[in-house]
Structure formats: C-alpha cells, structure tokens
C-alpha cells in the first residue's frame, strides 16, 4: 500500500510539471519516509512517536511520509493497529495531529493552512490513513483500492 501511495505522489508531481523522476529505487525523492516500527536510535521514528504520543505496542505497522523541507504541510500517515481495540485510540491520535497542524500552519503559510484544513482521516478495519496533501482524494482512493 505504501508503495502505491508513493507512486501516486510521483504521478501527481509529474502531472503538475515536475520533470525530474521523483520515485527512485522505491524512494520518494524530497520526502522522508519514516518507519515507526524502526527501533534504531539513528532513526527519526522516535521523534514522530513522541510527537504523536504513539505507543508502538498499539501498532502492527506504521509509516509517515513528510517533505524534507518544512515549507510544505504535506503529511501522510499510514497505520495498522495491532488489534481492533486500538483503532479508536489511534484515530484520536491522528485527530490531535490534525489540530496541532492547523495551529502551526494557520500562522505560517496560508496556502498550506488550507491544505491542512482539507485533511482526511480514514479507517478501514485495522488500517488508518491521515492525509494532508494537494489531492487527498487520490491517496484515499489508493488506500481504499489496496484494501479491497
């Protein structure tokens, strides 16, 4: 599913006029891909786990895609709850992240603030998706198709 999301982002950037290849060897150029299950002390996963107030025992899987530069509000979080009992709590964590992002961007860059206001949070079974992106509906479609 994460690969399909990265492919969609690369397609969208190309359609918007970005000429360079964005997806190289499975990596999305210009984006940090954070594996929340990576316990390596050199990994940035701990920063995001603390920021979101996540407990890794709630997760079977978790990934975040964010731009390397902090001038874009794009943020895609894909979580798989360890069990169904964790889904509602994880959804609340994602809703808190949206509130935090709204507070950050409403004072910083108005165009990015609009993007955050249009954020989408979806759940399907044990999967959760958080999307702040120019075309959130495209990422939601990839999410839904991947779970069929």
Model regions and ranges:
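Soluble, non-membrane globular domain cores that form compact, hydrophobic packing
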Residues: 1-75, 81-148
């Amino acid at each position: 599913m994460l690969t399909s999301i990265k492919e969609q982002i690369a397609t969208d950037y190309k359609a918007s006029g970005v000429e360079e290849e964005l997806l190289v060897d499975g990596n999305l150029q210009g984006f940090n891909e954070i594996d929340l299950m990576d316990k390596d002390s050199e990994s940035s996963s701990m920063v995001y786990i603390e920021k979101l107030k996540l407990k890794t025992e709630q997760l079977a899987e978790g990934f975040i895609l964010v731009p390397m530069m902090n001038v874009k509000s794009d943020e895609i979080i894909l979580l798989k709850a360890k069990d169904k009992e964790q889904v509602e709590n994880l959804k609340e964590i994602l809703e808190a992240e949206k509130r935090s992002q709204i507070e950050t961007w409403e004072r910083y860059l108005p165009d990015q603030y609009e993007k955050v206001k249009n954020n989408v949070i979806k759940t399907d079974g044990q999967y959760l998706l958080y999307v702040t992106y120019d075309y959130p509906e495209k990422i939601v479609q990839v999410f839904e198709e991947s779970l069929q």
